[in-house]
Amino acid sequence: MGITMDEEVIFETPRELISIKRIKDIPRSKDTHVFAACITSDGYPLIGARRTSFAFQAILSQQNSDSIFRVSTKLLRFMYYNELREIFRRLRKGSINNIDPHFEELILLGGKLDKKESIKDCLRRELKEESDERITVKEFGNVILKLTTQDKLFNKVYIGYCMSCFINQSLEDLSHTSIYNVEIRKIKSLNDCINDDKYEYLSYIYNMLVNSK
């Protein structure tokens, strides 16, 4: 299975509309975000779990008071349990029901390109930082995917670029250690996330990057 150049594949989740397209090169600009679809030495696809959910982060950025939260109920299913408890603590009225204690904010590892960096140097730096220096890169793949994500909750569009990255560590090397990175709380196998809304399109990304020529 493969994806031809400029062919677009669309996925939709309750929160996102994602366009995936194979391209030749990653543009270099101050706003370029690059991500690595990491494969362990024993063949497992890796994914990161954010320390803070995007929904809670957005709510915090919009608040004018430290004591009052105004929250749309449609956001609640996309937050961590501790974040919901904080919202509940500040509620003047209403209640929070149907909490999912197993929610995780899954993301590909990577980040924003520094203008002085190459694409691969940026990914090496980001992987080192986000794993507390546990991940080292063996080699990168040659296939590049452009990911265009429309966040339906906040009506925003994000563009990123992704390539495969084969690392020197096994899944066991990474799964039994604590991470203290400010953004990432855990690195785990994507195979353990089959019930997540993002699993289908993340699996597709990994399959395209690993199997395409």
UniProtKB/Swiss-Prot annotation:
EC numbers on record: 3.1.3.-
Keyword tags: Hydrolase, Magnesium, Manganese, Metal-binding
Family matches, as InterPro entries: NUDIX_hydrolase-like_dom_sf (IPR015797), NUDIX_hydrolase_dom (IPR000086), Viral_VD9 (IPR003300)
Residues noted as binding N(7)-methyl-GTP in the record, renumbered to the chain: 16, 50, 151
Gene Ontology molecular function: hydrolase activity; metal ion binding
Record-listed Mg(2+) binding positions: 117, 126, 130, 151, 183
Keyword check for Metal-binding: yes
Motif Nudix box positions after renumbering to this chain: 111-132
Description of what induces expression: Expressed in the early phase of the viral replicative cycle.
Active site: 126 (nucleophile)
Signal peptide (UniProt feature, chain positions): none
Reaction catalysed by this enzyme: a 5'-end (N(7)-methyl 5'-triphosphoguanosine)-guanosine in mRNA + H2O = a 5'-end phospho-guanosine in mRNA + N(7)-methyl-GDP + 2 H(+)
Transmembrane spans: none
Domain of life: Viruses
Cofactor(s) needed: Mg(2+); Mn(2+)
Residues of the Nudix hydrolase domain: 30-209
Protein family per UniProt: Belongs to the Nudix hydrolase family.
Task of the protein: Decapping enzyme that remove the protective 5'-cap from both host and viral mRNAs to commit transcripts for decay by the cellular exonuclease XRN1. Accelerates viral and cellular mRNA turnover to eliminate competing host mRNAs and allow stage-specific synthesis of viral proteins. Acceleration of the turnover of cellular transcripts may even promote the shutoff of host protein synthesis.
Full protein name: mRNA-decapping protein OPG121
